[in-house]
């Protein structure tokens, strides 16, 4: 499991110095209904004839790459890719070394 703090001090390209950044997880936006491919697909699908293009079934990956979105105090935003992981946590409790396991 990957646990990342909600704030991180890192370099800002705009300020050109190390500043505190607010960390969030990137989420993809809603796909546009007016993109050329979507318009073409909808036009082809309309009317009689069923499914016109193959539906993708051969899914290979079980995880997605984690993308962090960091915002500087000046407002500049940058993104950083982490490795693949099954479980990701933002600002969770930090593990301590000499603590007994709680049941």
Swiss-Prot record:
Q: Which GO terms describe its molecular function?
A: structural constituent of ribosome
Q: Where is this region: Disordered?
A: 37-56
| Superkingdom assignment | Eukaryota
What Gene3D superfamilies does the entry give?
3.10.450.80
Q: Does the keyword Coiled coil apply?
A: no
The UniProt keyword set, sorted, is: Ribonucleoprotein, Ribosomal protein
Please provide, in alphabetical order, the Gene Ontology terms of the cellular component aspect for this entry: cytosolic large ribosomal subunit
Annotated signal sequence is none
Q: InterPro entries, per this entry?
A: Ribosomal_eL44 (IPR000552), Ribosomal_LSU_eL42 (IPR053708), Ribosomal_zn-bd (IPR011332)
Q: Name one GO biological process term.
A: translation
Which family does this protein fall into?
Belongs to the eukaryotic ribosomal protein eL42 family.
Report the protein name in the record: Large ribosomal subunit protein eL42
Give the organism, scientific name. Dictyostelium discoideum
Supply the source organism's classification.
Eukaryota, Amoebozoa, Evosea, Eumycetozoa, Dictyostelia
Q: Which gene encodes it?
A: rpl36a
């Amino acid at each position: 499991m990957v646990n990342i703090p909600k704030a991180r001090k890192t370099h800002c390209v705009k300020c050109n110095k190390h500043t505190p950044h607010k960390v969030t997880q990137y989420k993809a936006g809603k796909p546009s209904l007016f993109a050329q491919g979507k318009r073409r697909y909808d036009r082809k699908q309309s009317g009689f004839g069923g499914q016109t293009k193959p539906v993708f079934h051969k899914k290979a990956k079980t995880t997605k790459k984690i993308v962090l979105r960091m915002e500087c105090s000046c407002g500049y935003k940058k993104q950083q890719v982490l490795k693949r992981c099954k479980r990701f946590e933002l600002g969770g409790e930090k593990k301590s070394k000499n603590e007994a396991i709680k049941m």
